């Protein structure tokens, strides 16, 4: 049976792990969200999130955005290649509804997978 958990091993945890993604990444972006990715040596993808206070002022809004992105990653982790991904949230994402944000991030997962595999 396929597991859809978001365990600790599926997260980027240390500053060094985040920093490595910023060096020569594969990119997929929209006006509101940018995904940066590099291949990893693990047998699964890993996710790191950054939601700047500059773009999303309220903590509950930042948490909502991170929750939707984590949930989408959790559900699509088996379709994503073995890469480390950092999600950068920019201005405009705060006005998006959860369903709209979910749809956008799904589109970006597919775009990133195509760029990595193609």
From Swiss-Prot:
Pfam families: Ribonuclease_P
Keywords: Endonuclease, Hydrolase, Nuclease, RNA-binding, tRNA processing
Catalysed reactions listed for this entry: Endonucleolytic cleavage of RNA, removing 5'-extranucleotides from tRNA precursor
Keyword Cell membrane: no
One MF term in the entry's GO annotations: tRNA binding
One annotated Gene Ontology cellular component of this protein: ribonuclease P complex
Disulphides: none
SUPFAM superfamilies: Ribosomal protein S5 domain 2-like
Record-listed E.C. numbers: 3.1.26.5
Keyword Magnesium: no
GO biological process, one term: tRNA 5'-leader removal
Top-level taxon of the source organism: Bacteria
Function recorded in the entry: RNaseP catalyzes the removal of the 5'-leader sequence from pre-tRNA to produce the mature 5'-terminus. It can also cleave other RNA substrates such as 4.5S RNA. The protein component plays an auxiliary but essential role in vivo by binding to the 5'-leader sequence and broadening the substrate specificity of the ribozyme.
Classification via HAMAP family: RNase_P (MF_00227)
Assembly behavior: Consists of a catalytic RNA component (M1 or rnpB) and a protein subunit.
Family listed: Belongs to the RnpA family.
Protein name as annotated: Ribonuclease P protein component
